[in-house]
From Swiss-Prot:
Gene name as annotated: murA
Protein's name in the database: UDP-N-acetylglucosamine 1-carboxyvinyltransferase
Species of the source: Gloeobacter violaceus (strain ATCC 29082 / PCC 7421)
CDD domains from the UniProt entry: UdpNAET
Region (Disordered): 437-459
InterPro entries: Enolpyruvate_Tfrase_dom (IPR001986), Enolpyruvate_Tfrase_sf (IPR036968), MurA_subfamily (IPR050068), RNA3'P_cycl/enolpyr_Trfase_a/b (IPR013792), UDP_GlcNAc_COvinyl_MurA (IPR005750)
């Protein structure tokens, strides 16, 4: 499945009785326009890349998310100054980077924290980073990162859960990735910007977030070409300068709202988007019967066709269908006509949302990494628990279509990757609220239950 062996991942922590939860009154259409936030995965990599320079950087379109706050805390623990200066703008001053080791209690909860390894090594000549945490969705090995840094001349050892890398000066090298890992590609690319000589990464990841990182590094003076292709060439430079940069829109949030439109048979306008970042998602959505049109610069309109039909999906590295959209599309296929087969080839443990969707009335069976989805006429509201970030989004989408009340616990997963998702959905007419157990909810508050007139039509 393209997976390399790694240290075992821990099971997701169960939701606590004191945790907040979402309550959704489903079965109603949505209407309106939604604004897409900046890409979480790009933002995290760019924050790490800012460590490569000794001058201040300003990042625009950074989403307000738990993962962003955690990365900010990690950078601050290293002596870096991070300051929000506007709603979605961060100033990062890396001049005072002086600490080469990150605290375990911060790194353990954020897998993207591993991105700081390459920049710290390139700047300080040594880095000590605990093995990272994040969603428990299967093996996500760091050995590709390690081999890449070793090819640049670093001495790397993993001991007692700590990755320690040393290099008096990194040197360019030629690296072939056994798997086009986004994280490994980005780690090597960042470190190589300050290495002596030329570095070539073959079988590199082609995701838009890799291109965004390369563009940011270029804006700081790095010499990178080929990002977005299978071969990336980096010519090292002695130093990088500060930069002001806008993060790309989040293609996964875009796809999530497209799925919400499809499952509720609603017409939504979604932007800003780069359609080329979503080619596989758009193709599958059209196969299933949705009508998708570009109605303005960077704005897509999704509207219902005659029926929602079954289709088969196989997750693949970009430009294939993204694993981060698998769970959301499974929710849509659960109420489509016919039988679909979803093959998860990127992460071997990313079907944990299936039992929760079945609690809502879906008919899904898992066999050897494949999910067989038999479409049903309707879903019914029920209490469910999110097991990871994208599973939480899938449950929200299913809850929007399910008749009756759905409650979703485990919102710490959702808050890692979606900025103000319930407020965005409320603005589209969804009957959704966040509650604390200490204040038991009524069925649905009158303000939310009323909703805008345009959203009152049942699905």
């Amino acid at each position: 499945m393209g997976i390399e062996p790694s240290l075992p991942q821990s099971s997701p922590a169960p939701a606590k009785l004191t945790d907040p939860y979402l309550q959704i009154e489903g079965g109603y259409r949505l209407s309106g326009e939604v604004t897409i936030s900046g890409a979480k995965n790009s933002s995290l990599a760019l924050m790490a890349a800012s460590l490569l320079t000794m001058e201040p950087c300003r990042l625009h379109n950074v989403p307000k998310l738990a993962d962003i706050r955690m990365m900010s805390a990690i950078l601050e623990s290293l002596g870096v100054r991070v300051k929000p200066v506007a709603a979605n703008t961060l100033d990062i001053d890396p001049r005072f980077l002086s600490v080469h080791r990150a605290p375990y209690e911060l790194v353990n909860s954020l897998r993207a924290s591993f991105f700081i390894l390459g920049p710290i090594l390139a700047r300080l000549g040594m880095a000590r980073i605990p093995l990272p945490g994040g969603c428990a969705i299967g093996a996500r090995p760091v050995d590709l990162h390690v081999r890449g840094l070793q090819a640049l001349g670093a001495q790397v050892r993993i001991e007692h859960g700590i990755v320690e890398a040393r290099a008096r000066k990194l040197r360019g090298g030629r690296i072939y990735l056994d798997y086009p890992s986004v994280g490994a590609t980005e780690t090597i690319m960042m470190a190589a910007t300050l290495a002596e000589g030329e570095t070539v990464i073959e079988n590199a990841a082609q995701e838009p977030e890799v291109v965004d990182l390369a563009n940011f590094c270029r804006s700081m003076g790095a010499h990178i070409r080929g990002a977005g292709s299978k071969t990336i060439v980096i010519s090292g430079v002695p130093r990088l300068h500060g930069s002001e940069y806008h993060v790309i829109p989040d293609r996964i949030e875009t796809g999530t709202f497209m799925a919400a439109a499809a499952i509720t048979r609603s017409t939504l306008r979604i932007g800003p988007v780069f359609p080329e970042h979503l080619a596989a998602v758009l193709a599958k959505l059209r196969e299933m019967g949705s009508v998708v049109n570009l109605v303005g610069p960077g704005t897509l309109e999704v509207s219902p066709g005659r029926v929602m039909a079954a289709t088969d999906i196989e997750t693949l590295p970009f430009p294939g269908f993204p694993t981060d959209m698998q769970a959301q599309f499974m929710s849509v296929l659960a109420v489509s006509e016919g039988t679909s087969i979803i093959s998860e080839t990127v992460f071997e443990n990313r079907l944990m949302h299936v039992p929760e969707l079945n609690r809502l009335g879906a008919d899904i069976r898992v066999r050897s990494g494949h999910a067989i989805v038999r479409g049903v006429l309707k879903l019914s509201g029920a209490p469910v628990v999110a097991t990871d970030l994208r599973a939480s989004a899938a449950l929200v989408i299913a809850g929007l279509a399910a008749h009756g009340t759905t409650t979703i616990a485990g919102l710490h997963h959702l808050d890692r990757g979606y900025e103000s998702i319930e407020r965005k959905l409320q603005a589209l007419g969804a009957r959704i609220e966040r509650h604390l157990p200490s204040a038991p909810p009524s069925e649905v508050s009158s303000a939310v239950a009323a909703g805008p007139d345009a959203a009152a039509a049942p699905v």
